[in-house]
Design a protein with these regions (language model features):
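NAD(P)+-binding Rossmann beta1-loop-alpha1 motif at the extreme N-terminus of oxidoreductases
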Residues: 1-55
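NAD(P)-dependent Rossmann-like dehydrogenase/reductase catalytic/cofactor-binding core
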Residues: 2, 217-319
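A structural signal for isolated positions on well-ordered beta-strands in alpha/beta enzyme cores
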Residues: 7, 29-31, 97, 119, ...
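Short, well-ordered alpha-helices that flank and scaffold nucleotide-derived cofactor binding pockets
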Residues: 20-24, 84-88, 111, 272, ...
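Glycine-rich beta-alpha junction loops
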Residues: 37, 101-103, 122-127, 150, ...
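Short, charged/polar "capping" segments at the starts of alpha-helices
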Residues: 38-43, 106-107, 154
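Rossmann-like NAD(P)(H) cofactor-binding subdomain of soluble oxidoreductases
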Residues: 51-135
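Internal alpha-helical scaffold of NAD(P)-dependent oxidoreductase catalytic cores
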Residues: 88-89, 112-117, 132-235
């Protein structure tokens, strides 16, 4: 099995790492899947990554059809509306890797195209947007981790993806416990993204404040209880996958980056998913419920819901 045609859906913070890595390979077809105004903009402007403009092909979903590998790098909220595009790209032999945050994007994609196309995967990259495009440190990036959900773990497509990535500067490794790896990353996201997003401070806050550490630990306990109830043994991967990329204490992870930019966040994928699973399993999730509602309120604040200047002066009172 050889991978010669690679399609990337989503050219943001995560997609930029993939585009950067594969652009050095001249023996494959590489394209970003986009149509309409976004597709025209990518054709015109390219992808600005680490101070350089990259110009992969830009394919409509139909032009990308039957790609050997489709890598999905979307925000969680964009996935439902992208399922038709994913179906259009997917051919009989297409392998799909979802590098989205969370633990259920594979299930959502499988509902549209069939689970046999999914090679489970995750990415750890501290990528952020600046005025001149997306930036990340290739040297400190943990990279892409992937594996089969069920044995055999050394399947032909795992070997094909290893061979493909091996000809790039991308950091990667295959694993035989991909679900535990995904939950380990999910834990990093929930426990590190959410409290700092509420406070509006860099990640050094967890080191410097026992109060921030206490909130992070509360979120962690709830997630680990849910994982255990679902048969996920986090200890399988703690030694090799318990940490993210090295960053400065001023670093702001994706949820806070979204709030800083006035965008809605992926809180439904983080605490929203854990609240739903907790209810299904009878496990209380008070820390996640608080984080969920606080970040939803911060989104409302960004939307202008709490702008009480001008004529919006109807009297209210504490209740």
């Amino acid at each position: 099995m050889d991978i010669k045609k690679v399609a990337v859906l989503g050219a943001g913070a995560v997609g930029s790492y993939v585009i950067w890595g594969f652009s050095a390979r001249r023996d494959i077809e590489l394209g970003v899947v986009a149509d309409g105004p976004r597709g025209e903009r990518l054709k015109k402007d390219g992808c600005a990554i680490n101070g350089k403009i990259y110009r992969p092909a830009v394919w409509t979903p139909q032009e990308a059809h039957d790609a050997d590998l489709l890598i999905v790098c979307l925000k969680y909220g964009a996935l439902p509306s992208a399922l038709d595009s994913i179906k259009a790209v997917t051919g009989p032999h297409t392998t799909i890797m979802s590098l989205m945050n969370g633990v259920d994007s594979e299930d959502i994609i499988a509902s549209a195209v069939g689970g046999e196309h999914l090679l489970y995967s995750l990415i750890k990259v501290a990528s952020h947007k600046e005025a001149d495009g997306f930036h990340f440190d290739p040297a400190t990036t943990v990279g892409i981790i992937f594996g089969e959900k069920e044995p055999p773990c050394d399947s032909p497509r795992v070997k094909a993806v290893e061979a493909l990535f091996g000809g790039t500067e991308l950091h990667f490794r295959a694993t035989d416990c991909i679900q535990e790896e995904m939950w380990s990353k999910f834990r990093l996201n929930v426990c590190n993204n959410l409290p700092q997003a509420i406070l509006g401070a860099g990640v050094g806050c967890y080191r410097d404040s026992v109060h921030m550490k206490a909130i992070s630990d509360g979120l962690r306990r709830e997630l680990e209880a849910i994982a255990a109830a679902k048969g996920i043994d986090m200890q399988k991967v703690d030694a090799v996958s318990g940490k993210g990329c090295a960053v400065k204490p001023s670093a702001r992870y994706s949820t806070l980056q979204d709030l800083d930019a006035g965008r809605h966040t992926e809180i439904d994928m983080f605490s929203g998913t854990l609240i739903r699973m907790g209810k299904e399993l009878g496990i209380p999730t008070p820390y996640n419920e608080f984080a969920y509602h606080m970040i939803k309120a911060l989104e409302e604040k960004n939307d202008g819901k709490f702008d009480y200047t001008g004529p919006n002066q109807e009297m209210t009172w504490a209740k």
